[in-house]
Amino acid sequence: MRTGEIHRVTGETDVSVRLGLDGSGRCQASTGVPFLDHMLHQISSHGLIDLEITASGDTHIDDHHTNEDVGIAFGQALSKALGDRRGIYRFGHFVAPLDEALVQVVLDCSGRPHISWGLTIPTQKIGTYDTELVKEFFVAVVNNSGLTLHIRQLDGVNSHHIVEACFKAFSRALRMATEIDPRRSGLVPSSKGVLEQAGGS
C-alpha cells in the first residue's frame, strides 16, 4: 500500500493528511471549508484514493490560508506516497463532463512542478467559497508534489459544474498516472532512469 502522511502546523493552520493511492475511495475530510471538503471527496471517490484530511485555521478571516495549506499538505503526502515513482504509468489524461461543463486535465508525475491554467469561472463565489481559491489549491498541490499539470475548460457556464468537473478530471487523470504498469517491471518511467522528488519537507 503506497501511503503518505503529513502533519503541517503554522501560525495560521494545523493540517493533517493521510493518503493511500491503492485505496477504494474512502474519504474523511473536515477542513472547515465545506466546498473544499466536497471537492476532496471528488478526488477520493473518482481517483480511488483513500483520504483522511483534517484542518483548522483562521477561517474567521477567510478561507485562503486553510485552502492553500491543505493543498500543500496534500501535495506533500502525494509525493511521499509516490516515492521514487518506480513502476507507475507516470502520465494521465481525462476529460470529465458535468452537465454543460467539460474540463480536460493532463498531468505528468515528472517531479517538475508546472501548472497551465485554463479555467474561466464566471462567478466570484460558490456558496461561501471564493472561486479564485480553486487555482490556489492546485498551485499548492503542484508545487509540493512535483506534478506537471495542464487544465483546460472546454465548455461550461455554471461555476459549480466547471469546478467539480475539474476536480473529477484531475482525480481520474491522477489515478491513471499513478497506477502500476505491469509491463514496467518496477522501473522508473523515464529514459534518464530517475524522476525528481518534490514536497518531502
Curated annotation (Swiss-Prot):
Q: Where in the cell is it found?
A: Cytoplasm
Grouped into one coarse class, the protein's main location is cytoplasm
State if DNA damage is listed as a keyword: no
Checking InterPro entries in the record gives: IGPD_sf, ImidazoleglycerolP_deHydtase, ImidazoleglycerP_deHydtase_CS, Ribosomal_Su5_D2-typ_SF
GO BP terms: L-histidine biosynthetic process
Q: In which pathway does it act?
A: Amino-acid biosynthesis; L-histidine biosynthesis; L-histidine from 5-phospho-alpha-D-ribose 1-diphosphate: step 6/9
What keywords does the record list, in alphabetical order? Amino-acid biosynthesis, Cytoplasm, Histidine biosynthesis, Lyase
Q: State the superkingdom.
A: Bacteria
The record's annotation in Pfam families points to: IGPD (PF00475)
Please give an example of a GO cellular component term from this record. Answer: cytoplasm
UniProt catalytic activity: D-erythro-1-(imidazol-4-yl)glycerol 3-phosphate = 3-(imidazol-4-yl)-2-oxopropyl phosphate + H2O
EC number(s) given by UniProt:
4.2.1.19
Q: Which SUPFAM superfamilies match?
A: Ribosomal protein S5 domain 2-like
Q: List the disulfide bonds.
A: none
State whether keyword Transmembrane applies. no
Q: What molecular function does GO assign, one term?
A: imidazoleglycerol-phosphate dehydratase activity
Q: Which family does it belong to?
A: Belongs to the imidazoleglycerol-phosphate dehydratase family.
Q: What is this protein called?
A: Imidazoleglycerol-phosphate dehydratase
